Design a protein with these regions (language model features):
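N-terminal/domain-start segments enriched in small and hydrophobic, helix-friendly residues
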Residues: 22, 29-37, 51-52, 57, ...
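Helix-to-loop junction immediately C-terminal to a conserved catalytic motif
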Residues: 1-25, 94
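Alpha-helical membrane-targeting segments
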Residues: 1-4, 57-69, 144, 148-153
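A cross-family acyltransferase "interaction/gating" segment
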Residues: 98, 110-172
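Short coil/turn segments at beta-strand junctions that form active-site/ligand-binding loops
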Residues: 17-18, 44, 95-97, 130
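Catalytic core of membrane glycerolipid acyltransferases/transacylases, capturing the structured
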Residues: 15-78
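Short, flexible loop segments at the rims of nucleotide/cofactor-binding pockets, characterized by
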Residues: 1-2, 76-80, 111
Length: 193
C-alpha cells in the first residue's frame, strides 16, 4: 500500500476459519485495505465479493481480479436458470474462507454511506455460526474516489468492531443492526479524531 493505514480493534478480526467481513464502500482501495489486515498466509482464503458486470467485462481486469485478488464475481441480476446468486459465496464459507462484502452494493461518494442491502443478512441466516465482522473505513474515498484514476496518498483509518451473529433475526432487522453498528464505528472514529 502507498497510503498509511491506522487500525483500531485489530483484536476483533478473526484470521482463521470462515468469517464475513462487512464495510462501508467509497473506493476500490477499500478491498485492498481490508485484505492488508490479514497475514500473507491467509490471503489465498480472503475472497472479496465483487460486481460481475464491472470486473468481468475486460479479460485483463477479469484475470487480475480473479487470479491475483481472488474475487468472487457476483451478478447483480440473476435469472432463475443461473441458480442462487450467492452459491459461490456459500461454497467459500463452507471451505472456511473469509468473505469481504460491501452491503451498500457499490461505491458511494467519499465519506458518505448509502443504505445497506440485505445480502449479508441472507448469508448470516444461512451461516449463523459464522461471525459477521463490521468495519468502518475512513480516508480511502479521498485517496482514490469513485470515478478517479489518480491516487492521492492519505492516511486511511480502519475501525473494526466486535462480530455480530444472526440467530433468528429477520433480514431487515439484522441489516438495520449491522448498519447501525458501522455507523457507531464511524462515530467512534470521529470522536477520537
Amino acid at each position: 500500500m502507498v497510503s498509511g493505514v491506522r487500525i483500531r480493534g485489530q483484536e476483533h478480526l478473526p484470521v482463521e476459519d470462515a468469517s464475513i467481513v462487512v464495510s462501508n464502500h467509497n473506493s476500490h482501495l477499500d478491498t485492498m485495505v481490508l485484505m492488508s489486515l490479514y497475514p500473507v498466509s491467509r490471503l489465498p482464503k480472503v475472497r472479496p465479493v465483487a460486481a460481475f458486470d464491472y470486473f468481468m467485462k475486460n479479460k485483463y481486469v477479469a484475470w487480475f481480479s480473479q487470479n491475483v485478488i481472488g474475487i468472487i464475481p457476483l451478478k447483480r441480476k440473476v435469472s432463475k436458470d443461473e441458480g442462487h446468486p450467492f452459491a459461490p459465496v456459500h461454497t467459500a464459507l463452507e471451505n472456511g474462507e473469509t468473505i469481504i462484502i460491501f452491503p451498500e452494493g457499490s461505491r458511494g461518494e467519499p465519506e458518505e454511506m448509502k443504505s445497506f442491502k440485505t445480502g449479508v443478512a441472507h448469508l448470516s441466516k444461512d451461516f449463523p455460526d459464522v461471525p459477521v465482522v463490521p468495519i468502518y473505513i475512513h480516508g480511502a474515498g479521498k485517496s482514490l474516489p469513485k470515478g478517479e484514476a489518480l491516487f492521492v496518498p492519505f492516511i486511511i483509518d480502519v475501525v473494526i468492531g466486535e462480530a455480530l451473529y444472526n440467530k433468528d433475526e429477520s433480514h431487515k432487522a439484522f441489516t438495520a443492526r449491522l448498519e447501525e453498528k458501522i455507523v457507531q464505528l464511524e462515530l467512534t472514529y470521529k470522536e477520537r479524531e
